[in-house]
């Protein structure tokens, strides 16, 4: 029996101490910005009806063509630099506008959550509305409809404007 123990101990001594091996290497990762691919209609048509109502688009659909990330609308900027149309602040009373005034309050966003595209505290030819990331979100490969609301005064004269405002929509990937 002692002979077997001695044989086992001598075999272990010949092998030496067993130690795990370790080494290190650097892993390099390079990321490139993911291209955002969003489809937005190129024009919006409004009709200010004779009875004081407005016909606004019901099919202004924004499509997130990405298959990997949700996107959020974070800002809308509007400008009427070359036209007579102007944006009104929240405090303006459109019932007091002069007849044929091209001053409007312009709201847009998700149904029931429309935001005023505001020029600030006074009437202006430019304005913007902002959303927090997640307020107007579109899932990957899905679409979402944008709704509009316009407050305005009365018109005596029929008017047609081929272009009233330029609009820029800014999107971001959800965090």
Name each model feature, range by range.
Residues 9, 19-69, 154-175:
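Short, polar/proline-rich extracytoplasmic segments that appear immediately after membrane translocation
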Residues 51-53, 120-166, 175:
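Exposed beta-sheet edge/beta-hairpin loop segments within beta-rich domains
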Residues 1-8:
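Bacterial N-terminal signal peptides that target proteins for export
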Residues 24-25, 34-36, 113-132:
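N-terminal secretion-targeting helices of virulence/extracellular proteins
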Residues 48-125:
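Surface-exposed interaction patch
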Residues 43, 75-81, 145-153:
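Generic short beta-strand segments
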């Amino acid at each position: 029996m002692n002979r077997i123990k001695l044989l086992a101990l001598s075999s272990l001594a010949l092998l030496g101490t067993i130690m795990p091996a370790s080494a290190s290497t650097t892993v390099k990762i390079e990321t490139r910005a993911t291209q955002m691919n969003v489809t937005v209609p190129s024009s919006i048509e409004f009709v200010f009806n004779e009875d004081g109502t407005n016909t606004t688009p019901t099919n202004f659909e924004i499509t997130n063509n990405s298959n990997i990330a949700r996107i959020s609308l974070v800002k809308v900027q509007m400008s009427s630099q070359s036209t007579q149309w102007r944006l009104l602040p929240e405090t303006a009373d459109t019932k007091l506008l002069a007849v044929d005034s091209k001053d409007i309050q312009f709201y847009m966003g998700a149904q029931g959550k429309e935001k005023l595209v505001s020029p600030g505290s006074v009437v202006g030819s430019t304005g913007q509305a902002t959303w927090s990331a997640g307020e107007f979100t579109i899932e990957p490969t899905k679409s979402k409809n944008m709704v509009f609301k316009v407050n305005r005064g009365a018109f005596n004269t029929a008017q047609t404007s081929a272009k009233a405002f330029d609009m820029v929509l800014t999107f971001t990937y959800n965090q």
